[in-house]
């Protein structure tokens, strides 16, 4: 994926085009390639990696947010077409929170201070477990971490209030106190050399587990438990 941390007024048309080509069209082209193999076999699951930003855009990442919105729209269209065709191929989206990945070390940035994942952040293994689970189940969407749930609820109930909140907090929450090096290399136009691994530089603050994810993946069991409790209460009231 590609992104740019920058105010809109400082972005160039070329940068928007590049982020769109890599982050959005990369998903489109990959999906088309997968469908060529999967449709004749009439089975399989395509897992699209989304973000909490699918539901709520934030300042300083306009190109990336727009690309993630586009991925969601593209995925919804595919899903409807597969249902119409009675295909057994499934499409799911895994909505990620902020993850401790090397993104923040190589992303192009015009910020005064180094970029950081918006707290609370999670280790990449949390996201990997969600993707693996989604590939083996038929869930339409999987939300990883409270930030994804918060974005959905907040933008549905009070989008205007969220605008003002992010206008006041969204700049500082995406930056550390450490000054950015304006001459450091980035991966917008070409990959950087070397293996950056899967983890970023925010090991101490990244969570290794997501209780929200556990609740989401186990919601059928939770529902069964609630139903069992309700049935027990009803029986007790009848006996009383």
Language-model segments: which ranges?
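Residue(s) in the substrate-gating loop at a strand-loop-helix junction
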Residues: 51
């Amino acid at each position: 994926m590609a992104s740019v941390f920058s105010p809109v007024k400082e972005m160039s048309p070329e940068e928007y085009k590049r982020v769109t080509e890599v982050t959005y069209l990369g998903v489109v082209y990959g999906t088309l390639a997968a469908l060529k193999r999967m449709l004749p076999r009439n089975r399989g699951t395509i897992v699209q990696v989304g973000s909490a930003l699918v539901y709520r855009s934030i300042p300083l990442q306009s190109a990336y947010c727009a690309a993630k919105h586009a991925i969601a729209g593209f995925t919804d269209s595919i899903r409807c077409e597969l249902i119409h065709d009675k295909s057994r191929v499934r499409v799911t989206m895994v909505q990620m929170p902020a993850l401790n990945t090397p993104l923040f070390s190589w992303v192009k940035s015009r910020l005064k201070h180094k970029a950081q994942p918006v707290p609370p952040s999670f280790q990449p293994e949390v996201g990997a477990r969600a993707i693996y689970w989604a590939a083996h189940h038929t869930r339409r969407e999987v939300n990883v971490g409270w930030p994804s749930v918060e974005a959905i609820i907040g933008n549905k109930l009070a989008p205007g209030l969220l605008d003002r909140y992010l206008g006041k907090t969204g700049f500082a929450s995406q930056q550390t106190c450490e000054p950015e090096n304006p001459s450091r290399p980035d991966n917008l136009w070409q990959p950087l050399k070397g293996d950056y691994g899967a983890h970023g530089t925010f090991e101490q603050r990244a969570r290794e587990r997501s209780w929200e994810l556990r609740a989401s993946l186990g919601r059928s069991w939770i529902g069964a438990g609630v139903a069992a409790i309700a049935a027990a209460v009803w029986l007790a009231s009848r006996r009383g």
